[in-house]
């Protein structure tokens, strides 16, 4: 029997998820289909219910439905609870829905694949939206020494700090801080741009002196060419830049494993996807 999976979003035609999951399934002999479903902005719950009623086993969720998906879940992973959003839904045997957030896990997996252990690293996270919030717990659990969050609206960065310093009786209290963008000083091992500024060819207003010859810069955005943020980072002398394509594949792999109990080969799929991206018409 072939199991049914899907990704819900609006818009959704650009989604790489059907290609990625198809590539994951092929060498593992997993019998499944995976489609992209355009849900009306005001009709996500109805679309999801219809999908599950028609035999759907699990689903990914993208913009703008991650918070709605969170609200529909009967149970949540620790990552999803703290992210306040869900990108992976699983229909359990008892008919309940479990929600996971694999975005941050995908980011960490990609960072480790590129850099090795994150233990003791000093990380600057630019942005304080949903993408930033979803990666904080996985980064802290990966053993980073310090996480500095900086955002145009400082109160949003401070809100994230308040959320995560209250976790586990303050277990992370000394490792997460918020700093105004124009007050950033010191050296960071890794700088992560979680904003979508690169999509418009723009840069977050951070000072150039935060980049040193040892700094690795990571842009969650990706494209056929180097992103605007990563181009800027290289021009300021960054040691290495990485885009978010590996995070996309990584989060998909975590979803696939949750559903199927099988760990797919991400590097093969990442190479295929990179080649596919470069071949697309500009």
Swiss-Prot record:
Name the InterPro entries on file: Aminoacid_DH-like_N_sf, NAD(P)-bd_dom_sf, SDH_C, Shikimate_DH, Shikimate_DH-bd_N, Shikimate_DH_fam, Shikm_DH/Glu-tRNA_Rdtase
- What residues make up the catalytic site? 66
Q: Does the keyword DNA-binding apply?
A: no
Per the record, its GO cellular-component terms are: cytosol
Q: What class of enzyme is it?
A: oxidoreductase
Any idea of its EC number?
1.1.1.25
The protein's annotated catalytic reaction(s) are: shikimate + NADP(+) = 3-dehydroshikimate + NADPH + H(+)
Its keywords, alphabetically, are: Amino-acid biosynthesis, Aromatic amino acid biosynthesis, NADP, Oxidoreductase
**Which residues are NADP(+)-binding?**
127-131, 151-156, 220, 244
For the ligand (shikimate), the binding residues are 15-17, 62, 87, 103, 222
Q: Which GO terms describe its molecular function?
A: NADP binding; shikimate 3-dehydrogenase (NADP+) activity
Q: How does it assemble?
A: Homodimer.
Give a short account of what the protein does: Involved in the biosynthesis of the chorismate, which leads to the biosynthesis of aromatic amino acids. Catalyzes the reversible NADPH linked reduction of 3-dehydroshikimate (DHSA) to yield shikimate (SA).
What's the protein name? Shikimate dehydrogenase (NADP(+))
Instruction: Record the organism.
Output: Shewanella sp. (strain W3-18-1)
Q: Which gene encodes it?
A: aroE
